[in-house]
């Protein structure tokens, strides 16, 4: 039986372990923390004598493929929910929202009426779906993506526009209104301050919609997203995966295929036939000798997150009939302002450059899944904080 060692017990490491142990491998996970979960873990707060759990990192579920959700066994343990109501978008000094309907024909009418959009919204959605199906096929069949495969499956025009092109060119191709471009291009900078003028940034837009667990939409997990990794950990342990927590890796010897790590009882060495790093990109470059000393990567970013608690269910001034809807507040009115704010945060010329706030109504979603909690919850995800500072160092 071949031995596989996985470094990291976030959702990617846990999913890999699940498939590999069921394929007949001897699988060991090494995790430096005292718990599994990676970014999908919980924190707790006691308010007025009542304890409430909330997501420490990731909050919403959306990018997981449905086949992974089913084949790992998670679908038997997890209750999920995604809003069928329209997303709601606000711009500065506007009290009434624009509704982002899931039906593209309704959306086309709404954007034309509210934002003066004269572009090709249906074409955008249809072409995006072609790219999404291509991405999902790569996932399902475990195909390494190449430009040749993209050109063969999608054709040169779609590939150049949606995969290799810039977000700016993609948005200009389909939309006439800056507000439409801002909303559709918002995901380009969610994970980092990428420039909309950089080649390849167009691909982020369909990628962020490529999960199939909720049919391409984003939603919530009953109790909290940490139930994904908690349940998957338990499933894996029952399948025979070994998980070593509180383990500090000292060295990786790729010649002898040995990994050395310290635990409470001292240093342990583990032989492997295959080694998988299910971590951030920095970890392998630090642990593997002469991996690539020229690579310099950062652990900082430009995103911020606030979890707000309320004694009573929230009542919205606008569209209160849609309590489960995601809401988006934009501080920018044009792609030019959007780009400047994102890039200024990268240049570290200030602590905060307003971009947008995404509001996740976690408390309302929990109620929709019959999970009654002591307080209502809103999660506010915001851009753009200074790139080189951590939260504690920002000017409050």
State where each predicted segment sits.
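Helical element adjacent to the flavin cofactor pocket in flavoenzyme catalytic cores
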Residues: 207-251, 255
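Mid-domain catalytic core of redox enzymes
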Residues: 250-371
């Amino acid at each position: 039986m071949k031995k596989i060692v996985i470094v990291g017990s976030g959702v990617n490491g846990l999913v890999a372990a699940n498939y590999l142990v069921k394929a007949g491998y001897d699988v060991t996970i090494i995790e430096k923390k005292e718990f599994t979960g990676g970014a999908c873990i919980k924190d707790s707060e006691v308010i007025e004598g009542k304890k409430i759990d909330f997501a420490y990192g990731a909050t919403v579920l959306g990018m997981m493929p449905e086949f992974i959700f089913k084949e790992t066994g998670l679908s038997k343990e997890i209750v999920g929910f995604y809003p069928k109501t329209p997303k709601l978008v606000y711009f500065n000094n506007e009290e009434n929202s624009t509704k982002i309907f899931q039906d593209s024909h309704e959306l086309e009418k709404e954007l034309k009426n509210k934002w003066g959009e004269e572009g090709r919204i249906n074409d955008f959605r249809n072409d995006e779906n072609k790219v999404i199906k291509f991405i999902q096929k790569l996932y399902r069949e475990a195909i390494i993506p190449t430009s040749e495969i993209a050109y063969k499956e999608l054709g040169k025009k779609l590939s150049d526009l949606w995969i290799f092109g810039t977000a700016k060119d993609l948005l200009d191709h389909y939309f006439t209104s800056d507000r439409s471009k801002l909303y559709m291009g918002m995901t380009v900078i969610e994970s980092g301050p990428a420039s909309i003028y950089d080649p390849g940034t167009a691909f982020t837009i369909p990628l962020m919609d490529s999960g199939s667990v909720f049919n391409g939409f984003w939603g919530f997990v009953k109790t909290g997203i940490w139930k994904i990794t908690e349940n998957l950990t338990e499933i894996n342990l029952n399948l025979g995966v070994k998980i070593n927590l509180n383990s500090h890796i000292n060295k990786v010897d790729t010649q002898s295929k040995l990994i050395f790590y310290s635990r409470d009882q001292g240093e342990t060495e583990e032989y492997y036939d295959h080694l998988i790093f299910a971590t951030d990109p920095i970890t392998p470059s630090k642990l593997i000798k002469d991996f690539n000393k020229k690579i310099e990567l950062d652990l900082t970013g430009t995103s911020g997150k606030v979890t707000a608690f309320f004694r009573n269910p929230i009542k919205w001034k606008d569209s209160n009939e849609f309590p489960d809807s995601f809401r988006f507040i934009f501080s920018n009115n044009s792609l030019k302002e959007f780009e400047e704010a994102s890039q200024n945060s990268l240049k570290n010329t200030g602590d905060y450059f307003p971009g947008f706030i995404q509001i996740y109504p976690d408390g309302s979603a929990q109620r929709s899944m019959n999970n009654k909690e002591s307080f209502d919850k809103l999660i506010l995800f915001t851009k753009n904080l200074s790139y080189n500072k951590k939260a504690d160092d920002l000017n409050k």
